[in-house]
From Swiss-Prot:
InterPro entries in the cross-refs: FP_N
Coiled-coil zones: none
Native organism: Autographa californica nuclear polyhedrosis virus (AcMNPV)
Taxonomic superkingdom: Viruses
Primary gene name: FP
Quaternary structure and partners: Interacts with IE0.
Secretion signal span: none
A Pfam cross-reference name: Baculo_FP_2nd
Name of the protein described by the UniProt record: Protein FP25
Additional remark text: This protein is missing from baculovirus FP (few polyhedra) mutants.
Amino acid sequence: MDQFEQLINVSLLKSLIKTQIDENVSDNIKSMSEKLKRLEYDNLTDSVEIYGIHDSRLNNKKIRNYYLKKICALLDLNFKHVIESSFDKNHIVAKLCDATRAKEWQTKSRERRLKNFNLNINYDGPVKIFVAATAEQKLLLKKTRDALLPFYKYISICKNGVMVRRDEKSRVFIVKNEQNIEYLKANKYYAFHSDSVDNFESENDSEKMLQNLI
């Protein structure tokens, strides 16, 4: 092997090593990003976000606790389940003892539909409670609602994405990305024809992107 060939081999080897290093770094960054997202999500599942309380003093813990206690009394919830609370921009974040309690708060809020008047605030506006979610989940929820309401009555954030269902008795679909949204939007016929659901599963491969919960 002459000197020229050796130089070519060395250059090729360096290029291969650099490519391998770049791929490893990229994989590590992706893995770390996924772990951070999971940690962020796990940290939020036992919390709720409360929007709409028309009071400029919500950064004060005593004021927050006053309203949290009022909400608990109105919705038949237990204030002892509240571990801590904070104020973030335009809403209260209440950390509860577990994810089950967070879902309970959201469910009872939907059933009662509180208003500021219920909290002795002279303002005609709703107070809404949601299970806490990441910015990414909230964006997916907004896109799903914009595209699928009113064809699907129930649209809400869940563990694996956004839950979509026609009514209380219909099947549940989990939307994980915009492709899922477009598929359901194109097939909104199924939102009104429950007897056609079986065909929905076998029509083509694209619906396999949707996770169906039985």
